[in-house]
Each structure stands twice: as structure tokens, then as C-alpha cells.
Amino acid sequence: MNKFLILDGMNLVRRIHAAQPNEADISGLKERVHGACKKLLKFHQPSHVAIVWDGNAISWRKALYEDYKKGRKPMPEALSNGLGDIKSYLAEHHIASLEADSEADDVIATLATKLVSIGGEAIIVSTDKGFCQLKHPNIKQWDHFNQTYMTVEAMEQKLGVEHKQFIDYLALAGDSGNKIPGVPGIGPKSAVELLKIFRSLANIYSSIEQVGSKQAKKLEAGKHLARLSYKLVQLQLDMPLNANLKQFRLPKANS
């Protein structure tokens, strides 16, 4: 079985860079990123590896909602200028890049689901909780910085909702990290309570007369934002990959 290690490029590199943010020379960062990749390869023993990078095009999410990810700090100039060197250095060590047009998340999700559909296994290396919506026994998510798997069970326990309610939960409660609005006035606690009673976002709105008047007003006023947030949270699984599995296969000595 093909075992594919999929690295969320900017998630990995920016976290490593944040440990020494004032470093002007990119060579040190380059070595630390490569060191992290070597550790990941040794631990997971994949047959294939790719590091997926965000592109410069405006994402469909940003086009749909202008405030999406608003307020995030821009990439430090030294890091931005050195990304090409990092990619080239990793390629020299058999870690090929896959460039997304805009956000890497949808490309990673598409790649992972396509792999498991043909009998492979995908390990996504990222701390982004959005990947928790990809529930499949052969898709795993690894948090490199805490050296642990981000499991569906852990996510359910942390949020207080079932896996199938994950997108509904974020549609109601929002996601401050990505500036996904959710329904104003419906925070995490209320979202959990509503989903325990009504089981889904659709059921909440179809049974709105059974919701307390205070919450019902908030839900009605924020209905368009709930729908918008639901769309923004969902990962796209049909992105064009323009890549061949063979180009990501590791040499026998590395796999």
C-alpha cells in the first residue's frame, strides 16, 4: 500500500520560523525545516512525500467573504524571500513541492481523499483543525510540534460535538483564527447545546420555533452568516492536482 506523507508547507515552516523570528539568514531556517522533514520521514516511513504550498491567487473563500483570514500577520520579508531556496533545498533531498493556486488546504484534502480512494494511506502533517473533517480510517493527521496524532476522538472531546457535527458547529460558533463569523451571539457553548438537542444545523433552522425566543432571534438574524460560514469551513475535495504520484515517490533508501 502506498503511504503518502503530505506536509502543510506554510503551517510547518511558519511555526519553525516563529521559534527564531528575527533570524535574517535563511540558511539556518532551511536546515531546521529539512531536519523536521527528516524526522517526519524517519518516524512515518512513507513511500511518497509532498510538501504543499499556498499560492498567490485570491482564494475562493476570500472572494466569497472579504474578511476571511483578515488581520493575519503578513509573512516576514526574509521568509518570503527565502521560500524558493527552502523549496529547492528540500527538492534536492527528495521532498517535492506541490504548488496550490491559492490555499493549500483544499489541495491537501483533495490529494488525501484521492489517495485513500485507490487504496493508499495519507498522513497529513499540520496543526490545522480543519482537516479533522476528513474522517477516513486511512487518513491521519499528525501534529509535528506536539508529536501526536490529532484524532477524531480528541476533537470530539475537545469541542463537545460529534465528528459529523464539526462543520455545523463552526457554522454556528465561528472560527476566530480564520475570521469565520458564525452566528453573532451564538458562541461555542450555545452551539454545543443546540447541536445536542437538534443534531444538525439544518434541523436547528427547520425547528426554529422550538428554540428559545432569545436564541431564535439570533439564529434568524444570522442565518445568512451560518450558511456562509458552513461554505467557508468545508474543504474542497475536487481540486485539480496537475501531478503524478510517481514524482513524489521516495528513493528506496529514504522510504
UniProtKB/Swiss-Prot annotation:
CDD domains: H3TH_53EXO, PIN_53EXO
Binding-site residues for K(+), renumbered to this chain: 172-173, 181, 183, 186
GO function terms (MF aspect): 5'-3' exonuclease activity; 5'-flap endonuclease activity; DNA binding; magnesium ion binding; potassium ion binding
InterPro entries: 5-3_exonucl_a-hlix_arch_N (IPR020046), 5-3_exonuclease (IPR002421), 5-3_exonuclease_C_sf (IPR036279), DNA_polI_H3TH (IPR020045), FEN (IPR038969), HhH2 (IPR008918), PIN-like_dom_sf (IPR029060), Xni (IPR022895)
BP GO annotations: DNA replication, Okazaki fragment processing
SMART domains attached to this UniProt entry: 53EXOc, HhH2
Cofactor, free-text remark: Binds 2 Mg(2+) per subunit. Only one magnesium ion has a direct interaction with the protein, the other interactions are indirect. Binds 1 K(+) per subunit. The potassium ion strongly increases the affinity for DNA.
Cofactor(s), names only, from the UniProt record: Mg(2+); K(+)
Domain 5'-3' exonuclease: 162-254
Domain of life, per lineage: Bacteria
Binding-site positions, Mg(2+): 105
Record's keyword terms, sorted: DNA-binding, Endonuclease, Hydrolase, Magnesium, Metal-binding, Nuclease, Potassium
Segments of this protein annotated with the region Interaction with DNA: 185-190
Sequence similarity: Belongs to the Xni family.
Protein name: Flap endonuclease Xni
